Amino acid sequence: MCLNTLCAILCFVLTVSFGFVSAQKCGESVFFRPNGNYDTNRRLVLSTLASNVSSQNNRFYNVSVGEGAGRIYALGLCIPGSDPRVCSDCIQLASQGLLQTCPNQTDSFYWTGDNADKTLCFVRYSNNSFFNKMALEPTHAVYNTMRFQGNLTAYTRTWDAFMNFMFTRVGQTRYLADISPRINQEPLSPDLIYALMQCIPGISSEDCETCLGKCVDDYQSCCNGFIGGVVNKPVCYFRWDGYKYYGAFGDEAPSQPPTPLPLPPPPPRDPDGKKISTGVIVAIVVSAVIFVVLVALGLVIWKRRQSYKTLKYHTDDDMTSPQSLQFDFTTIEVATDNFSRNNKLGQGGFGEVYKGMLPNETEIAVKRLSSNSGQGTQEFKNEVVIVAKLQHKNLVRLLGFCIERDEQILVYEFVSNKSLDYFLFDPKMKSQLDWKRRYNIIGGVTRGLLYLHQDSRLTIIHRDIKASNILLDADMNPKIADFGMARNFRVDQTEDQTGRVVGTFGYMPPEYVTHGQFSTKSDVYSFGVLILEIVCGKKNSSFFQMDDSGGNLVTHVWRLWNNDSPLDLIDPAIKESYDNDEVIRCIHIGILCVQETPADRPEMSTIFQMLTNSSITLPVPRPPGFFFRNRPNLDPLTYGSEQGQSSSMSVPFSIDSASITRATPR
């Protein structure tokens, strides 16, 4: 009896020690005006969602409210059969969490997942209808860092078989919580698997199985060998552990009954043959139980501080699970065929880039940093730490890294269509970029920069936005790459200063070149140059020999603008496909971005609104930075060298730009 009590206490202690992190995901780029129709409708829907969900027999409710830009679609659900009051409290908590965490995003969702919760619930809202639609991203994952003890191979076989068994049943019901047969294992390892799978009602059974299958795959790829984990997506949720949770398993018994305990031995006797009193036995047992519980609590507190790792796919403050991101050098060699010339994709800012294939047939891009690249250990760690925190469809995703044999290697997702400059500046290839695609590229880069500057947990300054750092996927959608020069800001920080200016000549703003000052407005300037290049189809440096433009695109465009002839800038390759108003608006936005004074340049959120809302009146632009009125005044530092390559120079802040020393471009 005492043994059973002790086990129950220990199980309770261990259970409450492992709290899962709730998954709040705010929309990436689209925002609404506070106190507008959408905001009013959102608050109305979320204020009534808890009662509406809990009153449904299946604990599921969706609704749409409003018209036009103020229309909102919302959905809430709990575990089927959960107590109405518990469900209502959970939905209310999730709704309040979204209002606080996502104050003006038009598309957000929230899965709860704390052990203190008595159920699992989900809330999502959007300005676009998502009912009955499949969505596999974004992903949120959590795993327990307590490793499995025992025969992992045998346990994994059982785990896989049980998950396959779950798959065969969950597609039709959209919800399943089940317990595996008992497994004979080591004392410190679980002998039961408690698994829960749930999909949003409305998606097909095939989509449900696909989503949950992806969740299981994601868990296995990051966290195999650990005891317990959660992976969730916008339309499905998966969790497994070695104990009950969420009230989902009730008093359900395992498939195989436990082996009965042996009968207790007769009471012990003292040396004189007398029975030891019951009071003495109780005192000894209680003392032992208290001692063991105190030790267990101490271990739990220590373990809890480091037990659960959250893989929010690049949103934590530190590097995301370095162990799961790190590749060994042999794997990289095999994947790239020993860095074969046939697999070389090109030369990046700090080294060569190769295509590779992992054993699971995942295509990768391998960035092998050259020993004399100038990107030392600091830049390498910088890129890994920053990129590992990011997740956005317009940013290249980091898969891992390798530091071995004096090599520094970054492994990225493979983006099939090379970089923007490969198409944009080639006389033959540029025909593949009609105006619709170019306009889409401008919009995608805008969304990516907006995420970096505002929507990610850190404010991140890329510092090297240019055509060669914009990769294109199979559908010509843009992805921002090469974060070796990126810097992150504190929440309350708006600008910084550096004694080592890095970037690409022609894309760097004047305050950065001359004084080393950088902010989000530095990226805005570079983006403005990129917009103008996309419109005209020419490199910034190609204007060095044109008329009296002073050798740069910015001066050339400013003169065309003042002469009321901005359409003279248009690339002949898009003469048959461009939209007159869109082109002029993009040129106008580009000029606003390259204004000399940083305060005059718009924020990326404003640029996004300018691009997506044609009714917004654009301000009159002021003269751009590096505007040259005649060729003799050309700045040799910035425009007398080969442009397009990332470079570095030292900036003594106490003197003016004439004292800047220039280093050889990498």
From Swiss-Prot:
It is a single-pass membrane protein. Residues 302-666 are cytoplasmic. Residues 24-130, 136-245 form the Gnk2-homologous domain. Glycans are attached at N52, N62, N104, N127, N151. Its main location: membrane. Its EC number is 2.7.11.-. The modification Phosphoserine is found at S468. The active site is at D464. The chain crosses the membrane at residues 281-301. The modification Phosphothreonine is found at T504. Keywords: ATP-binding, Glycoprotein, Kinase, Membrane, Nucleotide-binding, Phosphoprotein, Receptor, Repeat, Serine/threonine-protein kinase, Signal, Transferase, Transmembrane, Transmembrane helix. Residues 1-23 form the signal peptide. It catalyses: L-seryl-[protein] + ATP = O-phospho-L-seryl-[protein] + ADP + H(+); L-threonyl-[protein] + ATP = O-phospho-L-threonyl-[protein] + ADP + H(+). InterPro entries: GNK2, GNK2_sf, Kinase-like_dom_sf, Prot_kinase_dom, Protein_kinase_ATP_BS, Ser-Thr/Tyr_kinase_cat_dom, Ser/Thr_kinase_AS. CDD domains: Gnk2-like, STKc_IRAK. It is an enzyme of class 2 (transferase). Residues 24-280 are extracellular. SMART domains: S_TKc. The keyword Ligase does not apply. ATP binds at L345, G346, Q347, G348, G349, F350, G351, E352, V353, K367. GO terms for cellular component: membrane. It is found in: Membrane. This is Putative cysteine-rich receptor-like protein kinase 31.
